[in-house]
């Protein structure tokens, strides 16, 4: 199979469009709080800076990070007002004066963190990756954030995911949970996890043992099976204690935290809390010298030295047909308040997207 790599601009036309300011539609969180603070506005976007590339956004990703940023609990986030959009796929429309790696019209994607829920985005050239034209855009977009995060959880956060090991994943029918499940199964692990009961039948067909989160029966069941070698927990806060409790104790085991979704699960009326204190407590468990259990916290970081290496690896897996990204729901940009109002109630499994270009598939 062909290897997915950036570039390809050297032998292609280099004429640049005239650098002008454009009028665009974009999403804005006017203040932290409920969905009423989400709107789509008309704004101006400046030409790309020296080392930036301006892209016409086709699809933007939508995930729990959007909800966390709206309520103001995403770690180290910007202050409101802000434009969300953690990742995107689109086409290059203009290069900055010192950018030449990609050519106008080339299909690209990036982990943007902000500003992708807009018709155009300016982004540093170093964060872009080229996407082969034969790869489905939404599949590629799912890889950039959800599946790349899962790849890091499986291959960077621990070395214990392997054949015969028991892996427990909370929120296994979510975008990152489903991706983590798939990559663990590819490694030969036995996979267990919590999910909405409506998704249990489809998960069993994949060879997974699902549990209902709310009744806590999964704790006794996993202990009866000997405990988990790895637990992935995106819920955080006090929930880390329950996850720690189901780790196997007479063999090396690891609890990996990767989120603070308790803020979302508690509903709009609950007071949001900072994730930082619970993360400190999670990592403090490593100070216990009389156990083989350990902890870590993983987050995706586009400036990490292994980020591009991992992204290329998982994009190549997609290109080789080793997995497919299930799509749960796609919304139009102009209806962006809807996912904020219905988050957590959407049936199905997989990744969610925002269609920015109305001519793209919905």
Walk through the language-model features, giving the residues of each.
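N-terminal amphipathic/basic-hydrophobic helices that include classical n-h-c signal peptides
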Residues: 1-16
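Terminal helix/beta-alpha structural elements that buttress the NAD(P)+-binding lobe
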Residues: 13-49, 56-60, 64-91, 100-362
